[in-house]
Swiss-Prot record:
This is Uridylate kinase. InterPro entries: AceGlu_kinase-like_sf (IPR036393), Asp/Glu/Uridylate_kinase (IPR001048), Uridylate_kinase (IPR011817), Uridylate_kinase_bac (IPR015963). Pathway: Pyrimidine metabolism; CTP biosynthesis via de novo pathway; UDP from UMP (UMPK route): step 1/1. One of its GO terms (molecular function) is UMP kinase activity. The gene is pyrH. Belongs to the UMP kinase family.
């Protein structure tokens, strides 16, 4: 029995790279889509916000010295490419995915319209939110917090390469331990970088919990949705 009815899944662009230097690793994206398919079959409504670091990192050298707003718009376009790749992989897995973009690109994707997004979720479609918030200076983490609040998600699932929030960097400190649960205020006071400050504040103010878990760990997403001990829960 799922612990949540509607979730917002935040995928980083870097997670799509797999072991590649940049770009989209087909096997990796197919694995993610299979994980998403499993929770859709449980009756969970799934919305996705995707980053663009895997593509933008490939051109980041050329962005040195670039105006921040211009670089951010390039990043938004990178998320659009990832969203289309994710939608295509879903089609092959017989899941209906719909991309809604915060930037208008009408020949390619639908614009973001909140009531339509909610209706599509209720119809069992996976809604993929592209182009972040549509504004520069805001991260895709902030977009995840914003869209999660807008669609009435019960939780933001932040998929990373680490299986939760630790007392210290587990790669540098072998004695670091994983938090099972932690409050927003504790995470702030201990300077734990769960999300960027804007996204974190938005989730805290809206009382929207965050679950940090590993997307590369087999079956982790399903265990999170079933309410099992997986990852770290950040709550009010």
């Amino acid at each position: 029995m799922p612990a949540y009815k509607r979730v917002l899944l935040k995928l980083s662009g870097e997670a799509l790279m797999g072991d590649d230097a940049f770009g989209i690793n087909r096997a990796t994206i197919e694995g993610m889509v299979n994980d998403i398919a499993e929770i859709v079959k449980l009756g969970v409504q799934v919305a996705v916000v995707i980053g663009g670091g895997n593509i933008f990192r490939g051109v980041a050298g050329g962005a040195a010295g670039m105006d921040r707003a211009t670089a951010d718009y390039m990043g938004m376009l990178a998320t659009m490419m990832n969203a289309l790749a994710l939608q295509d992989a879903m089609r092959h897995a017989n899941i209906e995915g719909r991309v809604q973009s915060a930037l208008r690109m009408d020949q390619v994707v639908e614009p973001y319209i909140r009531p339509r997004a909610i209706r599509q979720l209720e119809e069992g479609k996976v809604v993929i939110f592209a182009a972040g918030t549509g504004n520069p200076f805001f991260t895709t983490d902030t977009a995840a917090a914003l869209r999660g609040a807008e669609i009435g998600a019960e939780i933001v699932l932040k998929a990373t390469k680490v299986d939760g929030v630790y007392t210290a960097d587990p790669k540098k400190d072998p004695s670091a331990t994983r938090y099972t649960t932690i409050t927003f205020d504790e995470a702030i006071s201990r300077n734990l970088q769960v999300m960027d400050a804007t996204a974190f504040a938005l989730c805290r103010d809206q009382k929207l919990p965050i679950k940090v878990f590993s997307i590369v760990k087999p079956g982790a997403l399903k265990r999170v949705v079933l309410g099992e001990d997986e990852g770290t829960l950040v709550h009010v």
